[in-house]
Amino acid sequence: MPVFSKAPRILRESVIFPYLAGADFLRWWAGSELRDTMPFGPRMPTSTEQVLHPYRYGRGDVPITLAFDQPDDGALYEDVFGEFDIRVLNAELSKTAEVTTPIAIGWGGDRFRVYDSPDGAALVWYTVWDDQPSRIRFVTSTVERLQKKRPLGYRLETTQPTIDGKPGVRLVLAPVRWTGWDNLPTVHVVKPAP
């Protein structure tokens, strides 16, 4: 396991998460009103938030899907962090030994893009939160920690837009000279099919 222990935390935690958190989720499932079925197909959890907090799954709390309004011209990568990866990021930024999941952080959904630039990668990340206190908690923990760890030559800018009636955060961490600062992408909520 020496190689595993030297891997970046996000890789180590992502390998272990499905087993440990998945086992906890199945223990919850076995005690729920769904115990005579299996969580496959349409019953499969759709977010790490649902796996971490099965009661949210049980009450039908589904993630809010965000999509960028502009085409991904120049984007290297686009995806969702999710609650689990945000927790790993917080643990890494605060240098705590373990990734804790005692309470739901109020994550509603997110979407990010990474762009290439001559001075380094640029991140544009939108999050949407269940309520205003959850957004404030994110800004005063994750965003403030990121600001302190911001690489030299980078700028971190956040705004707090309302996204489809929900409290949101737009976080941009990019080289100071990145040309994308003048034309930041926007997002919208993807409505589920009826």
Short names for language-model regions:
Residues 2-121, 126:
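Pan-zinc metallopeptidase signature
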Residues 108-194:
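C-terminal soluble interaction/assembly domains
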